[in-house]
Swiss-Prot record:
GO terms for cellular component: small ribosomal subunit. Belongs to the universal ribosomal protein uS7 family. One of its GO terms (biological process) is translation. The keyword Ligase does not apply. This is Small ribosomal subunit protein uS7.
Length: 156
C-alpha cells in the first residue's frame, strides 16, 4: 500500500458555454467511450430544448432540477453483533452532486423519447417541477433514512 499521503481531488474546468463546473461534470458523466463531443452535443441540445419549451434560462431549470434531485440523507449498512443495520448518514456536498447527476442520467436513459437530448431535457424539466424518476429516487432514499432513524446512534 502506498504511504505518501492523500491525493487531492482533481478539479474540473468549467464548460465553455455556461461557465459551470456542474455542467462539465454532467457532460463527463454523459460521455461514453471518451466521446466528449457527442456528450456535449447531447447536453447543450437538451438545454436548447429546455429553453424552447419553458422559455426560461436553461441554467435556472438545471439548478432547480439538481436541487430537487440531490439527496440530503442516505443509508449505509453497518454490521453490529451479527445484525446488519441500515444507518442513516448525511451526504457530503461533493457526493450529493455526484449522486444527483448519476440519478438524473439513469432516469434519463430509461425514458422513452427517441434521442438522449430529448430524454435528458424531459427529465430535467420534470425534476425542476419536483416530479420524475430521479426525484422519486431521492424521495425513496429519504424515506429509507427516515424509517431507519432509530439506528442513527450507530453513526460512523
Amino acid at each position: 500500500m502506498a504511504r505518501k499521503g492523500h491525493i487531492g481531488k482533481r478539479d474540473v474546468l468549467p464548460d465553455p458555454v455556461y461557465n459551470s463546473k456542474v455542467v462539465t461534470k454532467l457532460i463527463n458523466n454523459i460521455m461514453k467511450d471518451g466521446k466528449k463531443g457527442v456528450a456535449q452535443k447531447i447536453c447543450y441540445g437538451a438545454f436548447d430544448i429546455i429553453e424552447q419549451k419553458t422559455s426560461k434560462e436553461p441554467m435556472e431549470v438545471f439548478e432547480e432540477a439538481m436541487n430537487n434531485i440531490m439527496p440530503l440523507l442516505e443509508v449505509k449498512a453497518r454490521r453490529i453483533g451479527g445484525a446488519t443495520y441500515q444507518v442513516p448518514i448525511e451526504v457530503r456536498p461533493e457526493r450529493r452532486q455526484t449522486l444527483g447527476i448519476r440519478w438524473l442520467l439513469v432516469a434519463s436513459r430509461k425514458r422513452g423519447e427517441k434521442y438522449m437530448r430529448e430524454r435528458l431535457a424531459a427529465e430535467l424539466m420534470d425534476a425542476a417541477n419536483n416530479t420524475g424518476t430521479a426525484v422519486k429516487k431521492r424521495e425513496d432514499t429519504h424515506k429509507m433514512a427516515e424509517a431507519n432513524k432509530a439506528f442513527a446512534h450507530y453513526r460512523y
